[in-house]
A protein has these predicted regions:
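Short, conserved loop/helix-junction motifs that constitute active-site signature segments
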Residues: 21-22, 49-54, 105, 154-155, ...
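Acidic, Ser/Thr-rich intrinsically disordered and amphipathic helical segments
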Residues: 41-44, 185, 202
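Active-site neighborhood of phospho(di)ester-bond hydrolases with catalytic His/Asp-centered motifs
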Residues: 8-10, 27-32, 58-63, 112-113, ...
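Conserved catalytic scaffold of divalent metal-dependent phosphoesterases
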Residues: 12-17, 35-36, 63-182
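N-terminal active-site segment of His-dependent metallophosphoesterases
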Residues: 1-59, 65-71, 153-157, 162
Length: 254
């Protein structure tokens, strides 16, 4: 199997036009494509993302992309009245304009929502879910049973896992609390699945990568936090690009 050139970005928050990408085989975006998921924000991102010079382009949503999980607007009255003004019209479920956009994606662009795709014998699963915090955010699940039910849906033969949330202890430390806020339940599930690569975002100040050790005969998993924006929502981090061989598990940064 050939080396695959992979680029990872995340948490672009409407700043995608300020990002220059080198091109390659696979482009992955780990969510928070927008500020709050308004139509013009999503439309601008998809137009930009679709034009990038990659063979396959994959994205998920994040907690900011409210219209992808717009039932959040109806879970709490304060959220409803605070944010309903931004959506046209208010709906319980994905708005029709978003459904239409996702149905019209180019054949080389994929949106994953607790779902999988496969190409060239590479199996990829993606999810917008992250552990609950605050109120009114999209795709939040309580830690423990609720979020584990989502992670249990990751097929055991998955090669690449894409989530908005990082895993616990890897590129997940916040600067204001100095605590690791990633998902321990996801960490345990990845140890069961043993994918090659894991891509996440969400914690802007925790940009970077790490290796999760497995048994020697399995090889390590590489995990990445590709947040493009810093805490001030300024594009401050470079896209993460590397060549990867799924047979030898060899990774070389570009």
């Amino acid at each position: 199997m050939k080396n695959w050139r992979i680029t990872h970005i995340s948490d672009t928050h409407n700043k995608h036009n300020k990002i220059n990408l080198p091109g390659g085989d696979i482009l992955i975006h780990s969510g928070d494509i927008s500020s709050i998921g308004r139509k013009h924000e999503v439309e601008s991102f998809i137009k930009w993302f679709s034009k990038q010079p990659y063979k396959f382009k994959i994205f998920i949503a994040g907690n900011h992309d409210l219209t992808f999980d717009s039932e959040v607007l109806f879970r709490d009255k304060s959220v409803h009245f605070d944010r309903i003004q931004y959506f046209e019209p208010p709906v319980n479920g994905k708005p029709q304009w978003l459904i239409d956009m996702l149905n019209r994606l180019d054949k080389d662009v994929f949106y994953l929502e607790n779902s999988s795709i496969e190409f060239d014998n590479i199996k990829i699963w993606g999810s917008p879910i992250s552990p609950s915090f605050g109120y009114g955010w999209a795709f939040n699940k309580d830690r423990g049973y609720d979020i584990s039910e989502v992670w249990n849906g990751i097929p055991n033969d998955t090669d690449i896992v894409i989530t908005h949330s990082p895993i616990y202890g890897y590129n997940d430390r916040t600067s204001n609390t100095n605590q690791n806020v990633g998902c321990a339940d996801l960490y345990h599930r990845l140890h069961e699945v043993r994918p090659h690569l894991h891509f996440a975002g969400h914690i802007h100040e925790a940009y970077g990568w790490g290796q999760i050790p497995y048994k020697a005969e399995w090889g390590d998993i590489y995990t990445f936090n590709g947040c493009s924006c810093n805490l001030r929502y300024e594009v401050d981090n470079n896209p993460i690009t590397f060549d990867y061989n799924f047979i030898t598990r060899q990774l070389n940064f570009i």
